[in-house]
């Protein structure tokens, strides 16, 4: 049972990195226990945490009960409060049994309401093929009185005597909830039959709606009231007559929908104020919002709190195995452990562990245009019509036979002609370009920060006091058209600058969240039955020996904490809630015969064979506040000895995306997207510029053999100031920092720039997530070049942004650039004035071009190791660390230089420490714990 010590960098157990206890601990174990471990290795293998099925023993077993591998414990006490659900169990481990705490799990049933903001699909489910401006058959009454009737009369009937009411009366009397049928039309093909318009009557169904209401067909819904599909129980019939009132032309069936018409998944994008009297606007589907439990049920169990979120103790000792530490990393440790044990991109059904991820094309905009292909056309269904405007009039022609050198006789009988001149009439549709632009607008522009959006006309969040974290608000904000479009960084592989600091995991293309949402079904209301693992004990299998124990946990009920949404809206404000109806504990027992079990119990009762379990990251975490606009952070750590210290890992978090530490219910947490602090969805690593580590000693650390000065780690360097060429990989990361990350991830430093031999797939490692980028663009310091793209919206209630019309591109073929991008096409065809060409003979000159470089490194913690495996640190001992640091007390100052951000953030620091809990069970019903931690002892704040 080798002592595997977690490495902070990739959370991979690596023996050579830990110098405290040596490479193994077998020397401390009794010979009998070593033999037992060898014989039963499959029970205890860390990388086989969820073990293969083991056949229960058949000999030396006296009762059938002893062969059962899994037993259900019902709670002896529950406490259901508005914000939490507490369960307490009395766990009885019988004689000859050994309970594996690491493999136990909670079996939970309940009812979940994901709230009205839940929308697990894109587009609309109601008339999705209707044009966005299309109006359904409407009957509108307004003051005056004035009645406006608009629509199609699609049902026909035989009406040979037009001044006779009989045929029309029959149609009026047949009007019902299904007659006339809105799904039927005349049923005539234009070329197959030409109806005699004097012998037919027409009937249509019309909806009476509010004059000020929405009338568009796209997204319109009225619920049925009968099993035949009728949507109203009452129909009002009207007769359709000619202007003289003598000829019966047809009938209308009018149903009143003023109270029943709804738009469940769409919203009206109103035109700008100046056009509101002459433009009815266009429809837009509400944004998709997948909502499900978090990856591995993060935050469902109340972890990491100083108020004793979990309790495991025995009858005779009140000590709690669940050590109360607010800086533990239970959730994040579990993420890293799974990533090291298996692929995070498989086995999604287990423990809800569909990992958060994002579509790379959304994060890094690879704008290689579109595949043009040959022209694509749309044709009339019958394939006939006037193809040319200038041609002979063929409407009243006669056809003659062929005679002698001239026409013959006119063709006998009735001859009907429908002839047109020219090619088949058509409309060209650039499907590839339109599809590409749709992707850009719905996947990138829609997720721009709110400061690059403006409100549609009629929506005033300030006056109406609408919280910007609500789903209602998000659907009524539209992006500036020019920030990202088909021409943005054309030809480059470059993330949209305005999107770099936006959480890419809060997206409907987060496949893991989408899976977890779909696992619960497609209704906002669902009954769930889930299995939640015991993360606290999952690292080491804490084996409970025979006795009676009290086990207690608190389950959260805050929807923002336990649920995750792709939009990150405030689920509490949007009406989501959860009710637990049953929480049982499923306990797993070792399938061993009595002799083996008794021998194991005797050995584990021995104090020399105590069990240990540890936080997998082996780290103490701390959050340091960085105010909005700040670029500097200083961390002062009081003097202490640094034995057991393995290094620093750090990244950056948004304050709005980080709940209050240790809070069971954080009132100010109005966010439900990914929580990087808990789930590892880091995405702000690129905002660090440099880091320095200074000890109060004359010895430089980590030495002078790196490219840059001692104590300073320059993470990135602007291209303009990199005259020495210290950056690499076509980005602004320094060679020195690249070396440090290669060292801490793959133990490759002086081996050169090469790949590591390990074939294991790491989810959270450096090279997998390192994404360098470069591009060129116009130098707008040149007075002859003009930056036409404005990214600052004007705050008004007109629904228009005139600055966007500076750009002319696709004029006449899209909505006006100053209008919301979802409105209808306007304008005239015109030569484009943007972007400046960077290719071909017309490219702007080289002295007008500037180079841009940057990188992203999501899902990753920057790491600086403090170990002999890193680099020179002065005189080393066999413990692998300079005695100046390990044997003497020194204070430390860490300085960060960061990119400014327009909101409050935290620097998230993980200090690699020796952190272990030792558990001893000397006799029945006794649990004794000893807690070891260095260099940061329990409760010490940095």
Swiss-Prot record:
Induction: Expressed in the late phase of the viral replicative cycle. It is found in: Virion; Host nucleus. GO terms for molecular function: structural molecule activity. Keywords: Capsid protein, Cytoplasmic inwards viral transport, Host nucleus, Host-virus interaction, Late protein, Microtubular inwards viral transport, Phosphoprotein, T=25 icosahedral capsid protein, Virion, Virus entry into host cell. Its main location: virion. GO terms for biological process: microtubule-dependent intracellular transport of viral material towards nucleus; symbiont entry into host cell. Major capsid protein that self-associates to form 240 hexon trimers, each in the shape of a hexagon, building most of the pseudo T=25 capsid. Assembled into trimeric units with the help of the chaperone shutoff protein. Transported by pre-protein VI to the nucleus where it associates with other structural proteins to form an empty capsid. Might be involved, through its interaction with host dyneins, in the intracellular microtubule-dependent transport of incoming viral capsid to the nucleus. This is Hexon protein. It comes from Fowl adenovirus A serotype 1 (strain CELO / Phelps) (FAdV-1). The gene is L3.
